[in-house]
Amino acid sequence: MSLFPIVGRFVGDFVPHLVAVDTSDTIDQIAEKVAVHTVGRRLPPDPTATGYEVLLDGETLDGGATLEAIMTKREMLPLQWFDVRFKK
């Protein structure tokens, strides 16, 4: 339960964002925190999408897992890069 800074980029956008997330946030919550900076601003919403998915080093993460749970499985430094995209 502590703030953790990440860099999030929505796939298709050219602007990465510094996003403060909590280690108790789920991956789905992190996706929303990143997407809010892009979807509806520089990219239109996708009406066929069922939500968002988060990629870390090209691997899709489980949306229900917390950041803390992911951090126990792999080394993660502040300002870690996360990609977010529409889930089809």
Swiss-Prot record:
E.C. number(s) listed in UniProt: 1.14.13.69
Keyword annotations: Cytoplasm, Monooxygenase, NAD, Oxidoreductase, Plasmid
Catalytic activities: propene + NADH + O2 + H(+) = 1,2-epoxypropane + NAD(+) + H2O
Top EC class for this record: oxidoreductase
Regulation: Inhibited by propyne.
Any one of the GO CC terms: cytoplasm
Induction: Induced during growth on aliphatic alkenes (such as propylene, ethylene and 1-butylene), epoxides (such as propylene oxide and 1,2-epoxybutane) and chlorinated alkenes and epoxides (such as vinyl chloride, cis- and trans-1,2-dichloroethylene, 1-chloropropylene, 1,3-dichloropropylene, epichlorohydrin, and epifluorohydrin). Repressed during growth on other carbon sources.
One GO MF term: alkene monooxygenase activity
Domain of life: Bacteria
Disulfide bonds: none
UniProt keyword Cell inner membrane, yes or no: no
Subcellular location: Cytoplasm
Subunit structure of this chain's protein: The alkene monooxygenase multicomponent enzyme system is composed of an electron transfer component and a monooxygenase component interacting with the effector protein XamoD. The electron transfer component is composed of a ferredoxin reductase (XamoF) and a ferredoxin (XamoC), and the monooxygenase component is formed by a heterohexamer (dimer of heterotrimers) of two alpha subunits (XamoA), two beta subunits (XamoE) and two gamma subunits (XamoB).
Family designation: Belongs to the TmoB/XamoB family.
Function of the protein: Component of the alkene monooxygenase multicomponent enzyme system which catalyzes the O2- and NADH-dependent epoxidation of short chain (C2 to C6) alkenes to their corresponding epoxides. Also able to catalyze the oxidation of a number of chlorinated alkenes, including trichloroethylene, cis- and trans-1,2-dichloroethylene, vinyl chloride, 1-chloropropylene, 1,3-dichloropropylene and 2,3-dichloropropylene.
The protein's name in its UniProt record: Alkene monooxygenase system, oxygenase component subunit gamma
Organism classification: Bacteria, Pseudomonadati, Pseudomonadota, Alphaproteobacteria, Hyphomicrobiales
